[in-house]
């Protein structure tokens, strides 16, 4: 059997293992998923009338404005579970057992990554369905724009997942992993997810504009709602590629060096 065949076989085995864990212990996934859903309902039904003034529209306009940011926040929330899962594997010694077996070493991490991306996609679909149920519509987007939006969400999920894997590997326990990964769900709060960047204090606008989430959010808005994308599309892709590379090499270096 070739090296590629072994890698695919072992990665598939690790993927099944992680999906079985997620199905057997759904509480963590549900808790992480409920956060974006609750924020969506909170900002629409409690703060919607007040927040919509910031974009010059009504509540229905604010739903459309809010959803792209909440979809990305859903991905960030889901990947926190990945950091916890990786840290748990490291601290409980299962990784040490895998090291003694004749398996493709990177398959352990690849299984976590693919499983997390699949969970992120399912979570995004669920949050999207909730958004549609409360009034979100994207009637002008073409099939190509929908495909591009989906591709960006998958690429963003891949990038954040590799970062979360690295955070899990450097954390001594699951609690620390959860805390270390919190920026993945807090960064959207400092982006254009809830209010436009030009409505923020002048000194803070560059921080909000050029962090990873804002370009991706504005690109999703452009694809789904027809707003201007400008340079945000290239920035979003560049951030995704950079974070994926950073997370991959960080995780690989830590995984290969860690004696646990």
Predicted regions and their residues:
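Transmembrane helix segments
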Residues: 45-49, 168-210, 214
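Alpha-helical transmembrane segments and their short interhelical loops
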Residues: 105-181, 228-252
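Transmembrane helix-loop junction
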Residues: 44-49, 88, 97, 101, ...
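Hydrophobic alpha-helical transmembrane segments of multi-pass membrane transport proteins
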Residues: 38-43, 62-134, 164, 182, ...
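Membrane-interface helix starts
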Residues: 16-35, 232-234, 259-260
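Short alpha-helical transmembrane interface motifs in multi-pass membrane proteins
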Residues: 27-28, 65, 73-80, 111-115, ...
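Membrane-interfacial helix-loop-helix junctions in multi-pass membrane proteins
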Residues: 21, 54, 139-140, 191-246
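Short, membrane-interfacial amphipathic segments enriched in basic
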Residues: 1-15, 160, 203-214
């Amino acid at each position: 059997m070739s090296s590629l065949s072994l890698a695919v076989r072992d990665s598939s085995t690790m993927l099944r293992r992680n999906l079985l864990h997620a199905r057997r212990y759904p509480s963590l996934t549900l808790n992480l998923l409920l956060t974006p859903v609750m924020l969506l309902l909170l900002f629409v039904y409690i703060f919607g009338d007040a927040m919509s003034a910031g974009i010059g529209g009504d509540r229905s306009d604010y739903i459309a404005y809010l959803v792209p940011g909440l979809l990305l926040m859903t991905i960030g929330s889901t990947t926190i579970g990945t950091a916890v899962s990786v840290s748990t594997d490291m601290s409980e010694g299962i990784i040490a057992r895998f090291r003694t077996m004749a398996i493709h070493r990177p398959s352990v991490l690849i299984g976590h990554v693919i499983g997390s991306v699949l969970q992120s996609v399912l979570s995004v679909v669920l949050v999207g369905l909730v958004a549609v149920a409360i009034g979100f519509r994207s009637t002008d987007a073409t099939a190509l724009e929908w495909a591009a939006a989906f591709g960006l969400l998958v690429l963003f999920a891949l990038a954040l997942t590799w970062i979360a894997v690295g955070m899990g590997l450097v954390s001594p326990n699951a609690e620390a992993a959860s805390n270390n990964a919190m920026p993945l769900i807090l960064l959207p709060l400092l982006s254009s997810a809830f209010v436009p960047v030009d409505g923020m204090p002048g000194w803070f606008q560059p921080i909000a504009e050029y962090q990873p989430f804002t370009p991706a959010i504005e690109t999703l808005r452009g694809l789904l709602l027809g707003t201007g994308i400008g340079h945000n599309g290239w920035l979003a892709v560049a951030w995704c590629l950079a974070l994926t590379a950073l997370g991959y090499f960080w995780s690989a270096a830590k995984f290969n060096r860690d004696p646990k």
